[in-house]
């Protein structure tokens, strides 16, 4: 006779002593995680505090002295917002980031569905090539793409087109990899039942796959939004007209104007952080769920 394993779940602790024992047992883990979070947050906290400090205080003392002598001002933000082109640069960041997020989402989700559920020749080979493209550095494409855009005569380097296309192209391999790995975890019986009922691939993608894949799609969208919003290098190369340059480029230009005014530069840097912080905090649940689901087969 074979022994049966006890698979019953352990009951939750009910008494105070049991809860206290569990908390003490988890104490080292919580302590380590708390220290990691503190180290991660200290630079951002310092940046925020510095952005509200008077310039004279910033030059004479460290930002942590506000714990004993709190003195704050909004003058730094007022001067930065009054700088020429800041408002336009903020709008440019939105005009660059939103299309550069939506385009990869649309293309990557459709391509990932095809690679996961549509049978066609060399499907696995194509997926391996796409995965291999993840290892290609972005910098290797700068010269050929800039040359191609310039010689095309379309003026893409003087409008948003070049930035949109390059961000989309470099985002697709990761997006296809992430979403395809999530799509193949969907119930096969559900997909096959829809096909038996006469649903087309487009119908299956629209009515079944997309509603079930909201966490993965949202995670990829958040990741792409944050990446494009914080990008400096590609904006410097592909947004070659001052009128279309985003906030990241504008802040680097402020270094020449306020080279030693670190409180002003801190205010400008924190203005860039506001939108990504709002997006991530609002949608972080989808971000974590999507990454965990798409990281394994």
Name each region found by the language model.
Residues 1-22:
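Short, Lys/Arg-rich, polar N-terminal cytosolic tail immediately upstream
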Residues 26-297:
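A structural signal for multi-pass alpha-helical bundles of membrane permease subunits
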